[in-house]
UniProtKB/Swiss-Prot annotation:
Gene3D superfamilies: 3.30.70.360, Zn peptidases. Binds 2 Zn(2+) ions per subunit. This is Peptidase T. InterPro entries: ArgE/DapE_CS, Bact_exopeptidase_dim_dom, Peptidase_M20, Peptidase_M20_dimer, Peptidase_M20B. The keyword Membrane does not apply. Its EC number is 3.4.11.4. It comes from Clostridium perfringens (strain ATCC 13124 / DSM 756 / JCM 1290 / NCIMB 6125 / NCTC 8237 / Type A). One of its GO terms (molecular function) is tripeptide aminopeptidase activity. It catalyses: Release of the N-terminal residue from a tripeptide. It holds the Pfam family Peptidase_M20. It is an enzyme of class 3 (hydrolase). Cleaves the N-terminal amino acid of tripeptides.
Amino acid sequence: MKKVHERFLEYVKVDTKSDETTRVTPSTKGQLELGKILAEELKEIGVDEVRISDKGYVYACLKSNCDKDIPKIGFISHMDTAPDMSGKNVNPKIVENYDGKDIELGNGYTLSPSFSPELPMYKGQTLITTDGTTLLGADDKAGVAEIVTAIEYLINNPEIKHGDIKIGFTPDEEIGEGADHFDVEGFGADFAYTLDGGRIGELEYENFNAASAKVEIIGKNVHPGSAKGKMINSILVAHEFVSMLPLDEVPEKTEGYEGFSFLLDIQGEVEKTSLSFIIRDFDKEGFKNRKERFNEIAKELNKKYGEGTVTVTLKDQYMNMKEMIEPRMHIVETAEKAMKQCGIEPIKNPIRGGTDGARLSFMGLPTPNLFTGGENFHGRYEYISINSMEKAVEVILNIIKIYAEK
């Protein structure tokens, strides 16, 4: 039987960086390649009903081995890695018996406790890091490896009783499209867990309400020598727009349950400037107010510079899954129990982001999020503890056992 980290090291060889500009699903060929590898591997270890959809989603089912009426549990992870950094030619480094000090990644980069204060907690463990030139891909290939390893363990140990176990691997989660074509009905689970969290112990069932905002500003360009009273510099109007938002309600100044507006991108010249924002808030009313503020600013600036100068386009992305999880809190409580059984203290913090599970919960499949063990996702300083990965496998197995024993 393969060890979980061995699987992980195989999966990261496949470049699955997603790309929101391609407008196809999956957005990159590497995701389809990994999906085919996973489907074949699941068949080889004895999983039933393995299929890949025309959109690259991998679905499988390990059939029940007992007569009891046991809930059908799903486990889901995503195959893509973040567009933030290259996932090509990932060259993982194994750091055995970590000494708690700086780790030289190579290529002039160092992973240090001063940058990652949590590092010393992994002293004595074996870590997998990058070589400094790419991300690692623990988000979320660690989750994929943990699910496959847990399933293989069940197959190799048939004395462990379980109901139907549903498996799902999705593309394009990192660009917000992971649930777009997910076949909830065909998946057939009563509820599910995503393996897409970070540090060991993380158990998440609250996430941001999320929207995107596109702001387009139309200016008027005339010769600067005769511009007085005529020119409207769209770049400066854009600056004015941003300054009218709460200046302290930005990602770098917020934490916990605090929301924000985040200016992601600005492209402009005198006659036209475009701004791209994301809007985030845990509270429904606060979320509504943040979106309304964008429209109010546009209204004020249009009054000042002329109707049609500023246009705002808002688009909801996902909502806080808490309201869909709370009526079935046994899903969360079972995960807590499963963690405690293997010596892990659950960490229940809100997700300052989103997962496939957030949208799936609103599609009728309640899906809280479990840890994978990774740290510093989406960049060259990403790493993961093999011990944490092994514990994630244990938690999956414990959840399955708890429901089988009820």
